């Protein structure tokens, strides 16, 4: 009887751990997602890269995106 209860508790623990791990994996932001308000929420191997936006010389705020770590975008020369 004790073995059945112990086995049931172990199975319940394993299922709970698998569920928690699955929830944690889904909590991060994928590549290309906006991360302006939460810089630390990008998925593994992604970083939150920000730039300032200007329209006609007037600053319009900051935008941040989840991009691969080490990748840099630059403005194309016209």
From Swiss-Prot:
Modifications the protein undergoes after translation, according to the UniProt entry: Contains 4 disulfide bonds.
GO cellular component labels: extracellular region
Cross-referenced InterPro entries: Spider_toxin_CSTX_knottin (IPR019553)
Tissue expression pattern: Expressed by the venom gland.
Predominant location category: secreted
One GO MF term attached to the UniProt entry: toxin activity
Signal peptide: 1-22
Protein location: Secreted
Keywords: Disulfide bond, Secreted, Signal, Toxin
Prosequence residues removed at maturation: 23-26
Family note: Belongs to the neurotoxin 19 (CSTX) family. 07 (U7-Lctx) subfamily.
Name of this protein: U7-lycotoxin-Ls1g
Taxonomic source organism: Lycosa singoriensis
């Amino acid at each position: 009887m004790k073995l059945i209860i112990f086995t049931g508790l172990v199975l319940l623990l394993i299922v709970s751990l698998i569920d928690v791990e699955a929830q944690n994996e889904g909590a991060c932001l994928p590549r290309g997602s906006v991360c302006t308000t939460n810089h630390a929420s990008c998925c593994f191997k992604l970083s939150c890269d920000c730039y300032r936006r200007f329209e006609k010389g007037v600053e319009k705020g900051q935008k941040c995106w989840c991009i691969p770590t080490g990748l840099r975008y630059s403005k194309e020369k016209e």
